[in-house]
Amino acid sequence: MKLQVNGTAHEVAVSLTVRGLLDQMGFGEKPVVVELNQRALFPREHASTELSDGDVLEIVQISAGG
């Protein structure tokens, strides 16, 4: 399955949820904002949202600064 993540092509061998992709990419439980095909997802949707071939994602890690 081919995905575009933050403007870069990614290929994954199995179907995944957004949560599974975040885990594979090393985000774990870090706070992130995810946009899937130009639609922002609530964090509660990450585990139940299945990815499809050709999906476009933007993932932004939230960090605090001072």
Model-derived features: positions:
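Ubiquitin-like/PB1-type beta-grasp interaction modules and other compact soluble beta-rich domains
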Residues: 1-65
